[in-house]
Amino acid sequence: VKKAENSKERFVKRFGDDSDVDYPLAVVKNPYIGDTLGVSNIVIDGGVSDDADAGEREAFDRDKGIIVGNIRMGFGHYRISMAIASAANHLGYKPYWMDLNSYSETTGGKVIEAQNKLYSLGSRISGKSKAFNKVVWEPMNYEGFRKLSYNASDQMNAELMTPVFGNVPKDIPLVATHVWPAQA
């Protein structure tokens, strides 16, 4: 638990603490998969991730809405999110895309961006070095992520993602492709 608390504290020191910030949210059509999959983005209203070209604001559909939480970190998470949104749309639900990585002004968004850069670096090195794969990359990905200490840190770090959820309607279900949006 102490290791998990220290992990969270390091991120707060590095990226700040926005736990008291009230982020106003807006719903806009997703400019890429909005027409095809019926997806709308949940954005911070007037924030960096607010896509001005997406058109007018929409209201949340409280009867048929479903939020797909993701971190857009690694192609696997992104593909799974797309599949969930596609299935939800096919079944008559209204998918809302909640990409925590797009909220770059938030502490959580900054944490995700830093972790994504680190993961991308490791991934590139693993593609070039068999020794790195054997000694670092494979053990970390196959064994490290299963450790309770790692999962405790993930749980604690998920708290850094919670401020942006403050104005999300609590009566709309959320599915997520990563522990951070799921636990936040």
Where are these regions (language model features)?
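Residue-level preference for short coil/turn positions at secondary-structure junctions
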Residues: 62, 169-170
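An aromatic- and histidine-rich active-site surface loop
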Residues: 77, 155, 174-183
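Extended non-catalytic scaffold regions that mediate assembly and binding
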Residues: 52-54
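A short, glycine/small-residue-rich beta-strand->loop->alpha-helix junction that serves as a flexible
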Residues: 71-82
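Surface-exposed, flexible loop/turn segments at secondary-structure boundaries
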Residues: 74, 103, 182
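Short hydrophobic beta-strand segments
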Residues: 66-70, 174-175
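A short, charged/proline- and glycine-enriched loop
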Residues: 56-66
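Conserved N-terminal ligand/cofactor-binding loop architecture of enzyme catalytic domains
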Residues: 1-48, 86-169
